[in-house]
Amino acid sequence: MKTQTRKQRKKHTRWPWIVMILIMILIIAAAAHSMMRQASNADSSAAQSSSVSQAHPAPAQESEPTATPVPTATPEPELATDRPITTEEAAEMDALLDSMPGSISVWIQDIGSGLTYTYKPDNGFYCASTLKAPYALWLCQRDEEGLLDLDAAVGSESGWDLIYPLIAHSSNGAAHDLGAMWPGSLDTGFSDFLTELGFASPEGCEVVEDGIHGWVTGADGGRAMRALYDYFETGTENALELQEAFLAADHDLLYCPAPAAKKYGSWDQALHDMAIVYAERPYIISMFTDWGDQEVSFPEEGRERMQQVGQLAAEIILND
């Protein structure tokens, strides 16, 4: 009896362990299953998130608005950056001219800016030889247009042979011969040419066989020289040859601080000078007066006054 009871006791003591082992296996299996489900859900969520990102990509970050660039200021041409003749300088020139006797007309232009100083620009005078300047320009332009031929014989010389002494030496003989060959008058269109230049009384101005006639102002002289400057700038053969003649003029009335293309006029009650001054800052100066004497080409007192005006003009324009 005792033996049988011992066996039964051993049997009963094994069952709890078996149950515990089974429970442990079930717990482990349940835990493993749970972990597998979590991993599967995570993969699915990641895949779904990736799919959504591809279907609806995130908008790119907007860049900050670019400021509108401020344009760089274009520098003004050097000759137009300031007024070449200030109110004070004009007053100084006025005072100098007011101190001088007789009738005076002055026209000064800074070529770069086009700004102009005038003093009694409408005062009129007999033109004397100043009319030779626009007359020579008229001849050269008509030659280029084929309306006349300056290579043609004029007496014993050609027209070109006479242009140089007409301007450089103010030859009245050359003016007589050229005026006989190609008269500059109302009938030939010379007056119309002067009208285009802006002359005050072009109808009475002429260069003809019997002489030079006309009533002009200091402004007329300035405008004629400006037209010549523009013509020289074209650089044509005629323009350069004519410019050479003006540069060769060696009279000494208006002071010029640099080489100048110039033309004077001198007769009774007429002493005039006009010049294109090729300084670093080029300018034109024209001065007409009644200081002339038909017995003296360059009266000393008149010359000295013109020198003073030319000197002050150079100081004003060139800021010397």
Task: Describe each model-derived feature in a short phrase.
Residues 101-124, 147:
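Short, conserved catalytic-motif segment at the N-terminal edge
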Residues 109-111, 166-170, 178-182, 198, ...:
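Active-site-proximal beta-strand/loop segments in catalytic clefts of secreted hydrolases
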Residues 114, 124-154, 166, 285:
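Active-site SXXK
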Residues 147-190, 199-200:
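Conserved catalytic neighborhood of penicillin-recognizing serine enzymes
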Residues 213-268:
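A conserved catalytic-loop motif detector
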Residues 2-94, 100, 116, 124, ...:
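Structured C-terminal helix/loop/strand segments within mature extracytoplasmic catalytic/sensor domains
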Residues 175-231:
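Mid-domain, small-residue-enriched loop/turn segments at the edges of structured enzyme/sensor domains
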Residues 121-126, 155-157, 207-216:
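A glycine-rich, coil/turn loop motif that links secondary-structure elements
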